Regions:
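Glycine-rich, mobile lid/loop segments that gate access to catalytic sites or pores
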Residues: 144-155, 161
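General small-molecule cofactor/ligand-binding pocket signal
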Residues: 22, 146, 258-261
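Polyanion/phosphate-binding surface patch
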Residues: 26-58, 101
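Charged, amphipathic alpha-helical linkers/stalks
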Residues: 135, 159-160
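Phosphate/dinucleotide-binding and metal-coordinating scaffold of catalytic cores
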Residues: 80
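A short beta-strand-loop structural module common to alpha/beta enzyme folds
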Residues: 20-26
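Acidic, His- and aromatic-enriched active-site or binding-groove loops in soluble protein domains
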Residues: 42-53, 160-191, 280, 284
Length: 303
């Protein structure tokens, strides 16, 4: 009953913002899924459940973005753009389950496709997240909407002359900052890191100077600091887009919930600019009553 109430509450928020519903099957052709997965040099389909019928390979949907892209491609001539759609349903991940990761869970999705003012659309996504959490009963102190822009870090890596083939691994290493801290990230950026279990993860093999510059960048918390310290044109463009986003959000009621955090870079390579990652500011309890950390609860970006 509680889950149904939460679903109905969030759905009404999406409707209030002018989004229309779309339902898609839980299966997709495997060929339609691949480009939406995290890069895995050895097995790009390692995160999904694969099945084969008599004719073709099928995949349980990993998220709701790939089905949307397939739907839009098939119905492009019949849709009115910008096309605003929401969807919810179960998604499936072939990964090791733990306290904050599940192999199956219900996901809500809101996307805007087509030409529109980027800052306004990105701000709308932030406001949808805020209204959804508040309407579900959380107060403003219980969650934070962290925003960043992928161009900022991409520009820095270009400035530091980090080779293209290393850049994705660098981003993945930085994405682990909350879990392993700056020292752990530094190890991953250099030769590698051994975790508590003894498992060794090969590093990115960057130079000491490159690692030092990246770790210094991760300490920048304000727009003014970013504008002062970053000179690469792509980084400057990303900071400007972030500044425009915050200006639009400031006209509404949710600006106090939004925080700039350039360490939030998301794991998927298809993101191209604006990034958002929402975190709870409290610990939850599992079925055994043990306190656990909950990962990102509402995240995404421009792609």
């Amino acid at each position: 009953a509680l889950k149904k109430k939460i679903i109905n509450t969030i759905e009404q928020v999406f409707i209030n913002y002018g989004f229309e519903p779309l339902e898609t099957p839980p299966f997709e052709k495997s060929e339609n899924i691949g480009s939406f997965l995290a890069n895995d040099e050895t097995n790009p389909m390692s995160d999904v459940f694969l099945f084969k019928d008599e004719k073709e390979s099928l995949t349980l949907r990993y998220d709701l973005s790939a089905p949307l892209s397939r739907f839009v491609a098939q119905n492009f001539r019949d849709l009115i753009f910008p096309y605003k759609r929401y969807a919810y349903g179960d998604v499936f991940r072939q990964e090791k389950a733990d306290s904050a990761r599940f192999r199956s869970f219900t996901q809500f999705d809101a996307d805007v496709i087509g030409d529109a003012n980027e800052a306004q659309v990105d701000a709308e996504i932030c406001n949808i997240i805020a209204d959804s959490f508040l309407n579900c009963g959380l107060n403003k102190n219980q969650f934070t909407i962290n925003v960043s822009n992928k161009k900022i870090l991409q520009g820095l890596l270009a400035e530091l002359k980090v080779e293209d083939q290393k850049q994705y691994r660098v981003l993945k290493s930085i994405d682990k900052l909350d879990r392993i801290g700056p020292d752990g990230v530094g190890e991953l950026l250099k030769q590698g890191r051994k975790d508590k279990s003894g498992a060794f993860t090969k590093g990115c093999e960057l130079s000491n100077d490159q690692v030092s510059e990246i770790l210094s960048f991760l300490n920048l918390k304000k727009i003014k600091e970013l504008k002062t310290n970053l000179k690469n044109p792509l980084s400057v463009e990303g900071v400007q887009e972030l500044e425009e986003l915050l200006e639009v959000i400031s006209y509404g009621k949710n600006i106090d919930l939004v925080k700039v955090d350039v360490t939030k870079i998301r794991g998927l390579s298809y993101y191209s600019g604006f990034l958002v990652e929402t975190n709870l500011n409290f610990k939850a309890k599992n079925v055994k009553g043990k306190e656990i950390e909950i990962g990102s609860c509402a995240s995404g970006g421009r792609y």
